[in-house]
Amino acid sequence: FLLDVRDNKEGQKKIVSSVLSMCFIQSIIYLLFFIVAQNFITAEYKYYLAIDVVLNVFLSALLQFARGIGKTTNYTVSSFISATSNICLNVLFIAVLRFGAEGMFLATVLSKVVTILYMIISLKVVRYYAVHLFDKSVIKQIAKYSFPLIPNQLSWWVVGASDRVIVSKVIGVAANGVYSIANKFSGLFVSFYNIFNLSWTESVSLHLDEEDSEKFLTETINDMFKLFTC
């Protein structure tokens, strides 16, 4: 949506304000549900889970904001900051301070906080956000686009969470080890495709209304199939 208004500052502000306001609303609703349901959750580190979900909501929104306004450098640097701070904090909390499992969760949360702060400062999000610019029609358009993607994301989450458990139970732990190693190779392939897909989707959005868009799309799709099926 931001790609369509890349040259329209007011349009960008309206979209960013609407999305971030919706993130606040979603986070409040989620935390209210968590407060009600927390007595039924026996996990020792359930509060870290609640915080992590809220941080993920805002981090995802800010990452897409960076891509939408063409700040690919900030997008890349934020990923580096997230990974680096996570590793350093894990070493500090687990190896040095001996916090154990709690240190791992704390490191994850703090690394996301650091990344979010970097994104807010480097992208100057404050200049794009204003409560009065919240637009229900923008949210409806985004929801209309997003809802069909939910089953797909849930399916991938179920597969990712259950495949190793099923392999271990049905075939055995040794087979699960082989399966995990094999997944590393496919994971590398998927990572390569994801890098290509980031630039590809942006190019499609930017050139969709041009006269030679059909030729551009056809050639790119053909080349993509040749590359990833060879």
Give the location of each predicted region:
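Alpha-helical transmembrane segments of multi-pass membrane proteins
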Residues: 24, 36, 40-66, 80, ...
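Helix-loop junctions and terminal segments of transmembrane helices
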Residues: 1-7, 182, 186-225, 229
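C-terminal transmembrane helix end/exit motif
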Residues: 35, 63-68, 72, 94, ...
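Hydrophobic alpha-helical transmembrane segments
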Residues: 47, 78-126, 186
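Interfacial/gating helices of multi-pass transporter permease domains
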Residues: 101-104, 141-145, 149, 167-187, ...
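Membrane-interface helix-capping segments at transmembrane helix termini in multi-pass transporters
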Residues: 5-17, 28-54, 97-105
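Alpha-helical transmembrane segments of multi-pass membrane transporters/permeases
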Residues: 10, 51, 56, 66-91
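Interhelical loop/hinge segments that connect adjacent transmembrane helices in multipass membrane
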Residues: 47, 101, 117-161, 199, ...
